[in-house]
Amino acid sequence: MDVTVVGSGPNGLTAAVICARAGLSVRVIEAQTTPGGGARTLPDPEFSGVSHDICSAVHPLALASPFFSAYDLTAHGVRLAVPEIAYANPLVERPAAVGYRDIDRTCAELDDGRSWRKLLGPLADDCDGVVGLLLGDRRSFPPSLPAALRVAPRLLGQGTPLWRLLRGEDARALFSGVAAHTISPMPSLVSAGAGLMLAMLAHAVGWPIPIGGSQAIPDALIADLRAHGGELVVGEEVTEPPSGVVIYDTAPTALLSIYRDAVPTRYAKALRRYAYGPGVAKVDFVLSGEIPWRDPRLAQAPTLHLGGSRRQMALAESEVAKGRHAEWPMVLAASPHIADPGRIDSQGRRPLWTYAHVPSGSTLDMADTVTSIVERFAPGFRDLVVAVRSVPASQMSRHNANLIGGDIGVGANNMVSALVGPTPRLNPWTTPIRKAYLCSSATPPGAGVHGMSGFYAARTVLEREFGMGLPALR
């Protein structure tokens, strides 16, 4: 093989597709018995008509990622449902804060809609420029100077104590729930950057949900890989270096066990010092009916941030970053059947997907905690629970080896890691190991189902190893 890709997550498959389209022979090797990495969907072990998204469930970047946009997922058979409500944030003893696809409606329902519009309106008007900047390779001149000038002051405003300038407790909670996707202390530049991009995308393109589950995205990439002569092998763990060029969609530390003494001493030391971030505990529910939310608007919100107020979310993220369980942890929830009724089985059962933010490696079963938090905003929720599938953070790596300690970002979310990657290198997708490259979320631009880490790794490999440019993606 010209190129072997280890790991079949969205980044690995992106790199594989690009290399195959360039005319190279490509093989993808996946340790799990099913491909897709963080974008897999599997049937419930008891109720086969109900399927659970194993890691990611909602995909704000499916339409906006520069790679997915150029590749055109929909042209490759991925059907995306874009709900009217992108996300919402229930609040205690007051109406929820709701992020509609329509920014006008969002602002009309917030206490101070003008503040929200001032923050996000100009970004939504330049969606491509903003996404190109925030998902850039961190080494090129900003692709859009106007976008950079719009983002910079807002990044400082929401990534520092200046974030108090966003007015209205509901708006503050609405933004903080999105920023908390980074599982990092708030305010910070990292959480602000993610928050600005995701909140902006809600108004620019919406938060799409793949029909049939997240698996639709890797399935489309796999079909294209095979159409261009590539191969996929599942159920095979890589323990020795494959021949030829190898692109690793893995945690950086995996290279230590694969290459062992062949890892240069300084690089080995850097990898051993590599820091993983806080984790998530996964709790999937099978429900018999619709959740009885106090605020009826939430019945139309596929994505919910159940962290309470901005103050409560900031406290919870601070506690988790310090290695302590929060009394009220940040919980993300998704009801994909709201956008995709096909996720409801013939008996009316449907999935509820949730994550709870916890310290790295936590062994706690968070099912009761998550149930209590949902019940706080939807009395009677417990009565709907048919089954619970709970995975503590310490066990998340069993179904995805990259999620060490439950860290879905594959590395601590801080500004240094976001800019530099797993170790200080001019090109973070390279390694000092001959013909070995990285393309996981540990490399820029970081976590998320966007394919851009794989895109940049493939671009590097084509240029350095084969003297080739990027192929056509359509």
What are these regions (language model features)?
Residues 92-190:
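Rossmann-like flavin
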Residues 115, 290-291, 324-326, 362-401:
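Flavin-binding catalytic cores
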Residues 464-474:
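Active-site-proximal substrate-binding core of FAD-dependent oxidoreductases
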